[in-house]
UniProtKB/Swiss-Prot annotation:
Cell inner membrane listed as a keyword: no
Keyword Nucleotidyltransferase appears in the UniProt entry: yes
Pathway: Cofactor biosynthesis; NAD(+) biosynthesis; deamido-NAD(+) from nicotinate D-ribonucleotide: step 1/1
Pfam families per record: CTP_transf_like
Native species: Azobacteroides pseudotrichonymphae genomovar. CFP2
PANTHER family according to UniProt: NICOTINATE-NUCLEOTIDE ADENYLYLTRANSFERASE-RELATED, PHOSPHOPANTETHEINE ADENYLYLTRANSFERASE
Name of encoding gene: nadD
Protein's name according to its UniProt entry: Probable nicotinate-nucleotide adenylyltransferase
Amino acid sequence: MRIGILAGSFNPVHIGHLAIANYLAEYEGYDKIWFLITPQNPLKNEGELMNQNLRLRLLQKSIKDYNRFEICTIEWGMPRPSYTIDVLWKLHLDFPQNIFELIIGSDNWIIFHHWKDYRTILENFKILVYPRSNYKSIYFNHPNIYFCKDAPQIEISSAFIRKSIVEGKDIRFYMPEGVCREVVNNLFRP
């Protein structure tokens, strides 16, 4: 089975995450998209993270009706900080019948060279880079890299949503309904 790994904090999950995953499942030939919830991104501030169990619950609510989406929490049991290379190897060893491909946005592609063992990732795993309108992709000719130029660009970020909630903005159309209500009612209020 060909599985796309969409890793992220999902802090909170929003329609941009879901639209990209849906596009990749429907148009790029993935059998499944696994949402890999990272407990802590080594390149981000941990202080802004919601509780990981809450992030899991919100993601479960968001994808429950689509059988090509699954959630992967394999990273939760790994030493912290955990790194993408270690997670990919663990997935490869634990599920040898599957082909795992890393999905990243062009915002992450431009800093990919800062990732731990990025060359090892590049040599051993396929990477699909999807476009983000505020980030120019640096195209790189390598057999394991695919630039998905036609994917829809939905420029919503979790940081934008958190900021909007704190400012009292109406963000109901940026997140699945049940998720939006729970986030607004319980989180990020000043």
